[in-house]
Amino acid sequence: MGAFFVYILKASVYLAILYLFYSILLSKETFYRYNRTALLLLIPLSFILPLYPVHTAVPETYSNTTILDSLPAISYIENESQSKIPIGIIAVLSIYLIGILYFITRYVCTIIKLLRLIRSGEKYTDSDGLSLVVISQSIAPFSWFGKIVISKADFQNHRREILLHESAHIRKHHSWDLLAADLCIGLQWFNPAAWLLKRELQTVHEYEADNYVLEQGIDAKQYQLLLIKRSVGSKFYYITNHFNHNKLNKRITMMLKKKSNRKATLKYLYVIPVALCTVSVFAHPEISDELNKVSSVDLSNLTAMIGSSENTATIKNLSLIHISEPTRQAEI
């Protein structure tokens, strides 16, 4: 358990560094497809980098000790009946496990509520083969995998614009992106970078969908006005793509922004040296030594110590395994 937590801790640091690099250099570019790809690659990259072993050379130290071959060779094995685990490590690991269980429970409950809502609506299939769910509730339109959920009012008044927008999410498989981001958050729920990455990924999804709508001939001003009107709607499901997603100002700004120069794509090559530099973060001995202490914590020992009412101090028993002495024959 301790080793897994250290692995997740390293992955969270790598993700934070890589996301910081993205937000500084790439987030303002209009290469939506590249930005989406870059954000998605940060997730597996952050989990792969901790698997790469990096060690720094520690200078050897020599002491003025005289080695005597004639001295007896004594070997010891340290036998600990129970390793002593600091209470701080126990608390951190316990909180981490509770956080994972809470996130899983919340995620499952959200899916159950979403499925109930979809079942309660009227099912339609449009001419393009899109699966529509029309409900009586006044909620913001959203898409989830192959389904578009829309209220009756929006279906009657703004059907074309909304369906074009949500169909872009479906065609570009944005729901799978959010699933990957949620899996990352489930393991790194304590990491702000994981939450920021998902929010940025949702924003890029909206950029792509907005751009698709405008490419279909929808008037930009009318479409922006519709976004403003629908920005006051309620949204209930954080695992879906919403028509009135937050950061409306950024979306409108991106619609009006001049396309980035093609030379700006060279910025994406910076991810290679940045990834290599992040590997060296945990190569320092003082950091690796502390992490090794946490890695040595076993889940069985952890649960035993949490469940026990008494946590007594351990006593190290040193067992003498073998003693070899030079032997001589004595003459009488």
Model-predicted regions and their roles:
Residues 2-287:
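Membrane-embedded and juxtamembrane structural elements of multi-pass membrane proteins
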Residues 289-296:
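Ser/Thr/Pro/Gly-rich low-complexity linker/stalk segments immediately outside membranes or between
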Residues 307-317:
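Non-cytosolic, low-complexity segments of secreted and membrane proteins
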